[in-house]
Structure formats: C-alpha cells, structure tokens
Amino acid sequence: MRLILLGAPGAGKGTQANFIKEKFGIPQISTGDMLRAAVKAGTPLGLEAKRYMDAGELVTDELIINLVKERLQDSDCANGYLFDGFPRTIPQAEAMKQAGVAIDYVLEIDVPFDEIITRMSGRRMHPASGRTYHVKFNPPKVEGVDDVTGEPLIQRDDDKEETVKKRLDVYVSQTKPLIDYYNNWAQKGDPSTSLAAPQYRRISGLGSVDEIRARVFDALK
C-alpha cells in the first residue's frame, strides 16, 4: 500500500493517517521528519540539506526527492508507505514521477472550507496543561475558562480565523492543483513514464472520526 494523502489544513488527515498506518503496517513519511533525521545522522544528503537550512533557504526539490528515495530503501517501507504533506506542488509531483517513486492510491479528504474555518478557529487551549476545547464541539463548562483550574483559555495564533484563511489560500494556489494532476493521470495515463497510474479517490471528511475512517478503508480496497 503506497499512497499520498491530500486535503486542506484541518481536514483531518493526521487522524486518518494514524488509522492507515496501523491497518496496513506502513510508515508515515514526512519530509520534515526526514530532513531532521538526515541532518542529525550527518549523511551526505543531510549535510547538504543543513547548508540550505543554516542559510535560511528552502531545501531544493531535487534534494528532497533524493531524501525520499533514500528513505524508501529502509526495511519498514517494504510493505508500502504513506506520504504526509508531500508532494505539495506539481513540480514536486513531477519529480517524484521521474524518480520512479511508485504510488498506488492518491486519497483526498474533502471538507468544505467554511467547515474547516469553524473547526480550526473554534479551538481553545489552556496553556499550562495543554488541555484543548472547542467552542462548538467540546466547550468548557464555563465559557472561556479551563474546567479544572478556572484559568483563562487562549486561542493560538495558528487557529485565528485570519491565519486559517491564509493557510487555505496557500493550499488553493499550491496544493489543490495536485488533485487535478493526479486525477488526470489516473484517468488518462501518462506515456512519459513506465509507472502505473495511481488510483485517485475522494472521500467526504464530514461526519464522525469512525465514519470517515470507514470511508477511507472502503476507498483503499
């Protein structure tokens, strides 16, 4: 099972990724984790990545792809892998294809943006304990204060509506085009590569966690 999980920020990808990993016994591959591990291990690719990072520059797509290829040689990838947050752009997807990285499924978790804004902007946190609440789905007993201590709750900057909307704008401009890219490849094929086209699946990310998990597993049969 080799797959890419797509969806907007707040669509619930992280929760469903954990279910997929457990069911199929595959690792979740995050480029951020890969970069940190390679830098820590001092591998040639890690040292190259460190030069970019120390200079405050973005690591090149070519280097990321080489890290991906190196990571896929590890024994835990024998039964497959789950890409999390990669590729983010069409050039990265093209580079993966040219590098011969095989993908069986591209799974999109689709949630309307107004629902995502409600989900994310409604989060509240008690800083000292890390306890989390939601003004709509899991409200505190008394509005704005922690159930245990009575101390005030905060809204993280990342959860403010303005920030959420900016993240969704970036998703629309950079990552959403990947959906069309993979859908077209799945439907029409691509004579420029010997790789089999992945199957593209879209599921609704609305409903309970268990309902969405059932849809995910149905889509991957």
Swiss-Prot record:
UniProt EC number: 2.7.4.3
UniProt keyword Glycosyltransferase present: no
Residue numbers binding AMP: 31, 36, 57-59, 85-88, 92, 156, 167
Chain intervals for the UniProt region annotation (LID): 122-159
GO BP term, pick one: AMP salvage
Pfam families in the record: ADK, ADK_lid
Residues the record lists as binding ATP: 10-15, 123, 132-133, 207
Main localisation: cytoplasm
Region NMP: start-end pairs: 30-59
Entry's family note: Belongs to the adenylate kinase family.
UniProt-listed NCBIfam families: adk, PRK00279.1-1, PRK00279.1-2, PRK00279.1-3, PRK14527.1
Summary of the function given for this chain in its UniProt record: Catalyzes the reversible transfer of the terminal phosphate group between ATP and AMP. Plays an important role in cellular energy homeostasis and in adenine nucleotide metabolism.
Domain remarks: Consists of three domains, a large central CORE domain and two small peripheral domains, NMPbind and LID, which undergo movements during catalysis. The LID domain closes over the site of phosphoryl transfer upon ATP binding. Assembling and dissambling the active center during each catalytic cycle provides an effective means to prevent ATP hydrolysis.
Protein's UniProt name: Adenylate kinase
Organism: Paraburkholderia phymatum (strain DSM 17167 / CIP 108236 / LMG 21445 / STM815) (Burkholderia phymatum)
